[in-house]
A protein has these predicted regions:
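Metallocofactor- and cofactor-centric catalytic cores in central/energy metabolism, strongly enriched
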Residues: 1-187
């Protein structure tokens, strides 16, 4: 659904704060839904395996009309907003999946054969909400420039706003989704 895409906010533990003032609907497609506060419950939509009492669930026909109508009603921010990630970055690398990665498999294989990509690292855990829990951030910052970082789970929010550049024409950071998307990374 190319017309429904995006990533707003950081890790799951910040949802209740970050969604409180968001003038837009939020569609949850995977796990990590915190109980919505009444102030934004009418902006939360779910689909697939995730659901929550009191929210509108988009069924298997995937008719997103209620989400689109709510977006039009809310209108979004009146002025451009400036958001930063945990490291101060203003853009994040997100939105890959096993299908996307498999779609560029030839390009990855060519980059490996050419020696451009020599390492793959999978960050598949959570750094947690407390400051000082920076294991994955430090790991990624210290990764060699000839490595690709694949992510699963909320640990990515500790570093997905870092500019790691590209390698072999591909971004060095490829987000494979949440914990429950692990099967795709294995493919």
């Amino acid at each position: 659904y190319s017309h429904l895409k995006g990533n707003f906010g950081t890790a799951w533990q910040n949802q209740q704060k970050e969604f409180a003032e968001l003038p837009a609907p939020v569609l949850f497609t995977t796990n990590c839904l915190m109980p919505p506060k009444p102030s934004y419950m009418d902006r939360v939509f779910t689909t697939g395996t995730v659901t929550f009492p009191g929210t509108v669930h988009i069924n298997e026909e995937k008719d997103f009309t209620p989400v689109i109508q709510r977006a039009l009603e809310l209108g979004g921010y009146q002025e451009d907003q400036h958001f930063t990630g945990i490291n101060g970055g203003t853009s994040v690398t997100t939105g890959f999946s096993h299908g996307t990665i498999l779609g560029v498999a030839d390009q990855v294989i060519d980059a490996v054969k050419a020696g451009a990509i020599r390492h793959f690292f999978l960050v598949a855990g959570c750094d947690g909400a407390r400051s000082g829990r920076n294991y994955y951030t430090d790991f990624v910052k210290q990764s060699p420039s000839d490595s690709v970082i694949l992510t699963l789970a909320c640990g990515k929010y500790r570093f997905n706003d870092l500019d790691l550049g590209t390698i072999g024409g591909l971004p060095r950071l490829m987000d494979m989704g949440q914990c429950n998307d692990a099967y795709g990374a294995i493919k």
